[in-house]
Swiss-Prot record:
Disulfide-linked positions: none
Function: Acyl transferase is part of the fatty acid reductase system required for aldehyde biosynthesis; it produces fatty acids for the luminescent reaction.
Keyword Acyltransferase: yes
Descriptive protein name: Acyl transferase
Metabolic or biological pathway: Lipid metabolism; fatty acid reduction for biolumincescence
Record key words, sorted: Acyltransferase, Luminescence, Transferase
EC main group: transferase
GO BP annotations listed: bioluminescence; fatty acid metabolic process
Keyword Magnesium on entry: no
InterPro entries for this protein: AB_hydrolase_fold, LuxD
Protein species of origin: Photobacterium leiognathi
GO molecular function: acyltransferase activity, transferring groups other than amino-acyl groups
SUPFAM superfamilies per the UniProt record, alphabetical: alpha/beta-Hydrolases (SSF53474)
């Protein structure tokens, strides 16, 4: 294996106009002896940045995959916008922009890994874009139900102008009026709306649930998968996990292993998980995680300095 264990991801910027951009990180394959058919795109969950998935990117790269991560617009991370302006449609636009950008670079064979709220976005578009396969983990299938469980109240039953604007979801201000208005106007809220979008999916598909997930009902995931057209589909359980896949190192390692096994299997057009993968050691994971955090901080400081220069130039 090539000695690239501690190399940083390649930093790309997709210019979408109006001084707005999507930041993308590319991790090259670190096992050049294993040839994979697909590039993996990781869509981070709500309030998760792409550097939060450094470990998963390392697992996949060590098993021969090129890995693409990105931060959504109007979200936490390095792309344009603030999370209080986030909506599901903005997340959809961000994902589609990244997919289009890859295809413009002649990267056409793409497998998508999406977790939590981003999985609902993946379900929205996966049947309409040219993916090789789809993997979801603790994927939201009934957005209204998940929000009610997470927020302890069904705010979507209220008139939009009466919903508190400062709802905190996953430690961040949801920007509830923007988010809820988009949910209703674009039919993001119900299980039926999710099934209507994903039912024509005809590519290999693996969904992972967690047996301790209080936010996503496993029977609803099973109902969704049963309605998917593809004859290559399967559900697996992340035993011992909750909705938080990073709650401890045991759960996190199981998540990395499971996603990587699924990616290797689906790259071969199989839904039965492979038995063996190459695992990076703990020291390498620690170093790359720290290095990516430093890269994130460096880019954030550069962004702040550019904004300050613009303000000074306008005075």
């Amino acid at each position: 294996m090539e000695n690239t264990q501690h190399s940083l991801p390649i930093d790309h910027v997709i210019d979408i106009g109006d001084n707005r951009y999507i930041r993308v990180w590319e991790t090259k394959p670190k096992n050049k002896e294993t040839k994979r058919n697909n590039t993996i795109v990781i869509a981070s969950g709500f309030a998760r940045r792409m550097d939060h998935f450094a470990g998963l990117a390392e697992y996949l790269a060590n098993n021969g995959f090129r890995v693409i991560r990105y931060d959504s617009l109007n979200h936490v991370g390095l792309s344009s916008g603030e999370i209080k302006q986030f909506s599901m449609s903005v997340g959809k636009h961000s994902l589609l922009t990244v997919i289009d950008w890859l295809k413009e670079r002649n990267i056409n064979n793409i497998g998508l890994i999406a977790s939590s709220l981003s999985a609902r976005i993946a379900y929205e578009v996966a049947a309409e874009i040219d993916l090789s396969f789809l993997i979801t983990a603790v994927g939201v299938v009934n957005l209204r139900s998940t929000l009610e469980k997470a927020l302890k109240y069904d705010y979507l039953q209220m008139e939009v102008n009466t919903i508190p604007e400062d709802l905190i979801f996953e430690g961040h201000n949801l920007g509830s009026k923007v988010f809820v208005t988009d949910c209703f106007e674009n039919n993001w809220d119900s299980l039926d709306s999710t099934i209507n979008k994903i039912c024509e999916l005809d590519i290999p598909f693996i969904a992972f649930t967690s047996d301790g997930d209080d936010w996503v009902c496993q029977h609803e995931v099973k109902h969704l998968v049963s309605n998917v057209k593809s004859d290559k589909k399967k559900i697996y359980s992340l035993v011992g996990s909750s909705h938080d896949l990073g709650e401890n190192l045991v759960v996190l390692r199981n998540f990395y292993q499971s996603m990587t096994k699924a990616a290797v299997s689906l790259d071969r057009q199989l839904v039965e998980l492979v038995d063996e993968i190459i695992e990076p050691n703990f020291e390498d994971l620690t170093v790359i995680t720290v290095n990516e955090r430093r890269l994130k901080n460096k880019i954030e400081n550069e962004i702040i300095n550019r904004l300050a220069d613009r303000v000074l130039a306008s005075v």
